[in-house]
């Protein structure tokens, strides 16, 4: 992040990353924060209350940008934890895929994408999908997170003008789901209700519909 940059902070509640982004980007920068939970007002931050995985929220953000280039997208998005790690981790992968698929088309070439992600099944597919979209991809665990092996950050630097290889034909979500089918983590055509604890794709939506 640099002075004058435009930043999107996904999963911004309670606002810590957004505050840092405002300080770094300065008066010439722009920071948009989005979260399901309302945040207290933050000077210099445009706040959106909504689900980043839903088209109406995505469309609102694109409308707010009005063509402004986006230099960095940071995501601290996390599922509502159930205490069942396999399910929580699967939904985390699902959410990260959704945010990446929204971010890549609107992120400026040369831009950066940073996201929190839970370790486990599907993470290697996410890393591979990132590598065909960015020139440098690394995992990073801050000191505060190193006592827990479950959480890490994926740091993607220098977005390519165009995705390479399979990235031209498949979304991140499609690729990750395909790799998990091919590796036997999930079975193609498996009922959604049976996917809980195996993969987050569609599970959090199905669970929400049942509530």
Go through each PLM region and give its residues.
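S-adenosyl-L-methionine
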Residues: 34-82
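Glycine-centered, small-residue-biased loops immediately flanking beta-strands
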Residues: 5, 29, 111
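Conserved SAM-binding loop of SAM-dependent methyltransferases across substrates and taxa
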Residues: 14-27
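Class I S-adenosyl-L-methionine-dependent methyltransferase catalytic core
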Residues: 28, 36, 62-63, 166-170
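A generic alpha-to-beta junction signature in SAM-dependent methyltransferases
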Residues: 1, 25, 65, 106-107
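Conserved class I S-adenosyl-L-methionine
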Residues: 2-13
């Amino acid at each position: 992040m640099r002075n004058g940059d435009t930043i999107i902070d996904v999963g911004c509640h309670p606002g810590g990353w957004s505050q840092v982004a405002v300080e770094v980007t300065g008066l010439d920068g722009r920071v948009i924060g989005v979260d399901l939970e309302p945040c207290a007002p933050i000077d210099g931050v445009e706040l959106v209350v909504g689900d980043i995985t839903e088209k109406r929220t995505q469309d609102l953000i694109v409308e707010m940008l009005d063509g402004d280039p986006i230099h960095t997208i940071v995501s601290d998005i996390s599922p509502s934890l159930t205490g069942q790690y396999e399910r929580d981790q699967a939904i985390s992968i699902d959410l990260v895929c959704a945010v990446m698929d929204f971010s890549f088309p609107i992120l400026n070439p040369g831009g950066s994408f940073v996201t929190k992600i839970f370790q486990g099944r599907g993470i290697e597919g996410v890393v591979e999908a990132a590598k065909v979209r960015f020139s440098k991809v690394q995992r990073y665990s801050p000191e505060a997170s190193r006592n827990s092996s479950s959480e890490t950050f994926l740091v993607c630097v220098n977005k390519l003008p165009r995705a390479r290889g399979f990235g031209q034909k498949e979304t991140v979500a499609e690729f990750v789901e395909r790799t998990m089918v091919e590796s036997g983590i999930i079975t193609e055509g498996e009922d959604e209700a049976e996917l809980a604890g195996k993969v987050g794709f569609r599970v959090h939506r199905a669970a929400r519909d049942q509530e």
